[in-house]
Regions:
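N-terminal Rossmann-like NAD(P)+-binding subdomain of aldehyde/semialdehyde dehydrogenases
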Residues: 1-108
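Rossmann-like NAD(P) dinucleotide-binding subdomain of oxidoreductase/dehydrogenase enzymes
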Residues: 95-190
Length: 190
């Protein structure tokens, strides 16, 4: 499966998505910004649904019996307070702001486009990796591990349904590692 612009697409559309991706990424970089508050609010809303147990069937379906425990382990990292603290510690100053320095001034801005190749040993790790990129206003291209059973795609779908402004900043692909041509095309965009 492919996740592009907030939609799940079949693998048969990979060539078409890759063909259109550079233009879509460039348009997003040129015309849109993503504020951390937008991401944090979406994560907070999805997290509240998770806390109420509304997403338990989804977790069981895509992550198996141990999935709820794994999600509970990372849930504290996705709370508003933890995300705001992470941004303050790692960025130092708010995204898009300036800080005067003795030698000039510094502005914190997104890198642009990130290409994530994540390990498959923890369910949902690709989603967590992309969340970090979203928090800093980056476009995220995620190569899903072969063992991903759909949890990351489901998380991406939930986030973009909650907050449609995230959709142009989030893409995911179930591309086999042996498809080096497709992976190279994604890497070239980052």
């Amino acid at each position: 499966m492919i996740f592009a612009n907030g939609r799940l697409l079949p693998d048969s559309q990979l060539s078409q998505v890759l063909e259109e991706l550079e233009e879509a990424v460039n348009e997003t970089r040129a015309c849109r910004t993503l504020e951390p508050e937008t991401v944090i609010s979406a994560l907070q809303a999805v997290g509240e649904r998770l806390d109420r147990g509304e997403l338990d069937p989804l977790i069981l379906r895509y992550a198996g019996p141990g999935g709820r425990r794994e999600v509970a382990h990372i849930r504290p990292l996705l709370r508003r307070e933890a995300l705001e603290y992470k941004l303050a510690v790692e960025l130092g100053i708010p995204l898009y702001s300036f800080q005067e320095r003795p030698f000039g001034r510094t502005q914190t801005v997104p890198l642009g486009t990130l290409f994530h190749v994540t390990a498959g040993n923890v369910d949902g790790l690709p989603a967590f990796s992309a969340v970090e990129g979203l928090l800093t206003g980056n476009i995220n291209l995620v190569k899903l591990p072969s063992g991903d059973q759909g949890l990351s795609l489901a998380v991406f779908q939930l986030l973009t349904e909650q907050e449609p402004r995230l959709a142009p900043f989030l893409y995911a692909f179930q591309i086999p590692s042996r498809d080096t041509a497709a992976l190279r095309r994604l890497a070239d965009l980052a």
